[in-house]
Swiss-Prot record:
Keyword Ribosomal protein carried by entry: no
Pfam families per UniProt: AMP-binding, AMP-binding_C
EC number(s) reported in the record: 6.2.1.48
Species name: Escherichia coli O127:H6 (strain E2348/69 / EPEC)
Name of the gene this protein is made from: caiC
Record-linked NCBIfam families: PRK08008.1 (NF005947)
Xref: InterPro entries: AMP-bd_C (IPR025110), AMP-bd_C_sf (IPR045851), AMP-binding_CS (IPR020845), AMP-dep_synth/lig_dom (IPR000873), ANL_N_sf (IPR042099), CaiC (IPR023456)
Superkingdom classification of source: Bacteria
Catalytic activity as recorded in UniProt: 4-(trimethylamino)butanoate + ATP + CoA = 4-(trimethylamino)butanoyl-CoA + AMP + diphosphate; crotonobetaine + ATP + CoA = crotonobetainyl-CoA + AMP + diphosphate; (R)-carnitine + ATP + CoA = (R)-carnitinyl-CoA + AMP + diphosphate
Name of protein: Crotonobetaine/carnitine--CoA ligase
Function summary: Catalyzes the transfer of CoA to carnitine, generating the initial carnitinyl-CoA needed for the CaiB reaction cycle. Also has activity toward crotonobetaine and gamma-butyrobetaine.
Pathway(s) per entry: Amine and polyamine metabolism; carnitine metabolism
Length: 517
């Protein structure tokens, strides 16, 4: 069944401009408060100009172009401008430094880069090392360095016509993007995403939150991340809704932005919820139009209830990863929700819990969460130039091994336990880091928490907590370990505590555990 009707991204944008015309498509708010607005017609014209810009710089179908940008209109222009001419976007995490960025450039074969002045010194050094295929850099800023191979993105774009000049034949099976995984446990892998993947993501994510053309979807998730692209942007654009892209998250500003733009849908991760909850109470906390808050793992029930009660919202849980494109397990718009369940398998997907021998497990037993989809359509196509890694997680019949552990109940609701690599082996017992983190997060003095296993000569692994305290609080080891003993089984009680000012996180708010072991 062809859910997207054979329509690639170029056709999508031409149709959106015709159907929705002067309706607001995109609102971007920068960290300095500058706001840019584009109608569907204007946005399509900017996308066309950007496509023409790339064509004048020698970019053709199949070429890879890297983007190292914070949330901004130029990211959207480039994403779909490249897709219109059959070129391939390679978004780079804006937090990455030189060595990691070089590695992605090398392993994606990107020949052109679009970035901003703040990141340019790093790429100037990368070019001098001559270790990549990069031959040109476009800067989104007005002022330019007097360097060879550097040009102004804005000036070049504004010189282009608003109609597309180069339109090679496209297929929905063509690659639109190579999105590198966050690499929290190993080197990032390039996830190949097709035009079909992105079109399907729009329809699927819109179904998941019952999105309409009168909705306003606001996000602070980074544009280089799968959540922003496939859960938010593609859903909003596919339904003719308004997409609000905020440059960076600010706990002090976020709720005001939700209210100012009259958002009906937004998305939150645990870090956002915890930092919002320590903001001063306001009589206007529940003065909003939010219908759903898309939520991604992981939160204790106490934290969830407190957040929902204070702000008058409900969470729509969604579980997925870069390779699944969307939240393939989640709550459904009209169905019951069963916290702490992560929901049920969505349409076009199957889900199973499997044991270490790849055999399906019955309800109630913990094993690996496995998902069945269609590669290149409802799940990723492959890892770029890495067939060995692809074969390790993706079976020939479309079953994807997530590397996450969980279980399901008799009614088909799934429950997340932990990443397999985060399960601690302690004296013959398996201990979930997430379970312990959810318990410790209820301590009134603790704002943020991560638990890791460290080598122990007697019990395989000992358990250590890294915590961030609420402002002005102090916490003794005696108080902390007493709390643990009162709230968890004896074999789960932690051995070590380290108090920190912050915790290392990637772009999607996930703790980078390998930096703590």
């Amino acid at each position: 069944m062809d859910i997207i009707g054979g329509q690639h991204l170029r056709q999508m944008w031409d149709d959106l401009a015709d159907v929705y015309g002067h309706k607001t498509a995109l609102i971007c708010e920068s960290s300095s408060g500058v706001v840019n607005r584009y109608s569907y017609l204007e946005l399509n014209q900017e996308i066309n100009r950007t496509a023409n810009l790339f064509y004048t710089l020698g970019i053709r179908k199949g070429d890879k172009v890297a983007l190292h940008l914070d949330n901004c209109p130029e990211f959207i222009f480039c994403w779909f401008g490249l897709a219109k001419i059959g070129a391939i976007m390679v978004p780079i995490n804006a937090r990455l430094l030189r060595e990691e960025s070089t590695w992605i450039l090398q392993n994606s074969q990107a020949c052109l880069l679009v970035t901003s002045a703040q990141f340019y010194p790093m790429y100037q050094q990368i070019q001098q090392e001559d270790a990549t295929q990069l031959r040109h850099i476009c800067l989104t800023d007005v002022s330019l360095p007097a360097d060879d191979g550097v040009s102004s993105f804005t000036q070049l774009k504004n010189q282009q016509p608003a109609t597309l000049c180069y339109a090679p034949p496209l297929s929905t099976d063509d690659t639109a993007e190579i999105l590198f995984t966050s690499g929290t446990t190993s080197r990032p892998k390039g996830v190949v995403i097709t035009h079909y993947n992105l079109r399907f993501a729009g329809y699927y994510s819109a179904w998941q939150c019952a999105l309409r053309d009168d909705d306003v979807y606001l996000t602070v998730m980074p544009a280089f991340h799968i959540d922003c692209q496939c859960t938010a942007a593609m859903a909003a654009f596919s339904t003719g809704a308004t997409f609000v892209l905020v440059e960076k998250y600010s706990a002090r500003a976020f709720w005001g932005q939700v209210q100012k733009y009259r958002a009906t849908i937004t998305e939150c991760i645990p870090m956002m919820i915890r930092t919002l909850m320590v903001q001063p109470l306001s009589a206007n906390d529940q003065q909003h139009r939010l219908r759903e808050v898309m939520f991604y793992l992981n939160l204790s029930e106490q934290e969830k209830d407190a957040f929902c009660e204070r702000f008058g919202v409900r969470l729509l849980t969604s579980y997925g990863m870069t390779e699944t494109i969307v939240g393939i397990i989640g709550d459904r718009p009209g169905d019951k929700r069963r916290w702490p369940s992560i929901g049920q398998a969505g349409f076009c997907y199957e889900a199973e819990i499997r044991d270490d021998h790849n055999r399906p497990l019955p309800a109630g037993e913990i094993g690996e969460i496995c998902i069945k989809g269609v590669p290149g359509k409802t799940i990723f196509k492959e890892y770029f130039l890495n067939p060995k890694a692809t074969a390790k997680v993706l079976e020939a019949d479309g079953w994807l091994h997530t590397g996450d552990t969980g279980y399901r109940d008799e009614e088909g609701f799934f429950y997340f336990v932990d990443r397999r690599c985060n399960m601690i082996k302690r004296g013959g017992e398996n201990v979930s880091c997430v379970e312990l983190e959810n318990i410790i997060a209820t301590h009134p003095k603790i704002q943020d928490i991560v638990v890791v296993g460290i080598k122990d000569s007697i019990r395989d692994e000992a358990i250590k907590a890294f915590v961030v305290l609420n402002e002005g609080e102090t916490l003794s080891e005696e108080e902390f370990f007493c709390f643990c003993e009162q709230n968890m089984a004896k074999f789960k009680v932690l051995s070590y505590l380290e108090i920190r000012k912050d915790l290392p996180r990637n772009c999607s708010g996930k703790i980078i555990r390998k930096n703590l072991k």
